[in-house]
Amino acid sequence: MPPDADQIERVLGPAGLLARSLEGFEFRESQLAMARLIDRGLTEGRQVLIEAGTGTGKTLGYLTPIVLSGKKAVISTGTKNLQEQIAHKDVPLLARATGMEIDAMLMKGRANYLCLQRYRQAAATPDLLGKATARVWKRMDRWLQETEFADRSELDWLADEDPFWDSVSATSEQCLGARCLHYDDCFLNALRREAAASRIVIVNHHLFFADLMVKRSGFGEILPRFQVGVMDEAHNVENTATAYFGERVSTNQLSDLVADAERAVRAAGDDPDFERKPLERALGAIRSAAEAIRGFFRERPERGTLDDPARAFLRDETVEVLRRELERVQERCGLDRSDDPVLHGFSARAGNLARALMVILESDDPDWLAWYERRKTGVQLHASPLDVSGPLREHLYDSLETLVLTSATLATDGDFHYVRSRLGLGENLLEGIYESHFDFASQTLMYVPRDLPLPSRPDFADRVAERIDELLRISRGRALVLFTSYHNLNRVHQRLARDFPYPLYRQGEAPRSVLLNRFTRNIHSVLLATGSFWQGVDVPGETLSCLVVDKLPFDSPGDPLVAARMNAIRARGDNPFMDYQLPAAIIALKQGLGRLVRSSADRGVLAVLDARIVTARYGGQFFRSLPDMPLRHALEAVAAFFQDDADSTSAGRPVSP
């Protein structure tokens, strides 16, 4: 039976079970209203779209009606941190408060778990792992005797950047399935059995969509069947769906296939039934083709469409060889007389790569884009849908009783028009916008200088670097500086590196987790970052007291996927800037602001160094989408804000917990 409103209030109300069991509980009307809206969605079998600002108590707002309903649910998040919070904090808290036994299971992406087949294979050829010592192997063997699911996070002694884990982790490409010698002892299989028996399974978006694709293929499933889906941090859904509904082939995949196959060939020894020479020749040809692809794209922009010159290259003999040799590997490894499950696994991998390559090269559908991406480690070739609304309706919306999509950043200018159109959400939709519980008027200050040049001016980067230097000295470090390009990031780093008095960290110097750990530990440090640091950074307290944004975060029209989507919007007679670029930038800026205020005790300055937010006609949409914050244009106001903090601290009132 679905819960009624009284049941929900008995848990979340001002005198409810949470209030009685949780010291310092603060009743939030918005949390109760959100839970009631979701309860209605569960009862009526409807989709629910919710923006719940920071401090709303969003996770308990959806957990409560779902738990009370008794329905089987999968909760998907954009970040591992939120997964951990739900599983290890929110679910136990709700269980203690209600006295209910909540059967919940945390399930991460497969690369977070050890593969016994790869581990045994690596142990048989330890020379291939370089620095992995006998001591490491001994500790791993002992751990495998004790662990339940072989989760990477249990190995706190193994550094994040240690390449050892990449050699033994579970991957979809290298999974042998039921053919595997360790199938019965597989940690992932044990994890899935546990998940199948759980009422609530907590995953991330990548695993959620990987499951959709497996179910779409008709060959099994990763997650158990469920009635209710919750997409938390749903502002990421379009990007994740684009990746999973599309196709991708990378030079790294090709190189990994060759390396793994060569390792298996060596392990096969002198088996008389195994013809190694033809396979070795095919692997050598694949390696050469991968190098040719890297070489061709080395002199091209980092991202671009597969234009005529690129297609001409990809269709020449190099890629024809690649396709032919992949098929040859598939044939040689899949021969009936070979009963080696590892070789059959290589056959499947080679076949999948050959098929994906065909899709990418022969893609001429105007609703899809064939494009490439050049990274430090290699080249990726993509075929991506320009619109994911159709596949989402077919494979997600129509398969669930109720789907809840929620985030702190979904609405723009007070409505959900943008996210509804991008995700293809129907009319039978329940909507709710619940403002942040935090007092931005007293906790924050927004600084927008009027004396800086516009981003289109050639002196913008130098002038912004000077102003950031001034700001960070006023804030005494304690800042995250977010850029829309590496060019400006490097320009600012070059200036600050001369004589900046506080610890300075730059994205790319170390893995993301290492940088965030250093930044969090050192209160007066500064982190310069771009890209992924616009979201998913949780640093409450004084360490992050100033958030600086160099430019409004518009997606670059030079990005191939952005450009193609803009062209598609223009072709149907709509305005790509107003309908796509602007709302996406508003959501990105809201995400950035979410890094600054993470608790009711946090105080901080948001500095937007792009005057267009106050001078352009569209600037009002940014302000109407952000919480009410005092707006100032002079550095003296920033100094006064931080002086007030200093005075409050010296008077005995803590600024942060």
Residue ranges and their predicted role:
Residues T484-G508:
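Conserved helicase motor "Helicase C" RecA-like lobe of SF1/SF2 P-loop NTPases
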Residues A73-T79, V404-T406, G477-T484, V608-L609:
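Conserved RecA-like ASCE P-loop NTPase motor core of nucleic-acid helicases/translocases
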Residues P2-S21, K71-R199, H206-F209, A261, ...:
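A substrate-engagement module of RecA-like helicase motors
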Residues L68, E84, K89-P92, S172-E173, ...:
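Signature of the SF2 helicase/ATPase Hel1-core->accessory helical subdomain module
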Residues D39-R40, T59-K72, K89-L94:
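Walker A/P-loop NTP-binding motif
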Residues P449-D459, E509-A616:
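Conserved RecA-like P-loop NTPase helicase motor core
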Residues D166-V201, L212-G220, R328-L452, D459-E466, ...:
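A contiguous, basic/glycine-rich beta-loop/short-helix subdomain that forms a polymer-engagement track
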Residues P2-I50:
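Conserved pre-motif I regulatory segment
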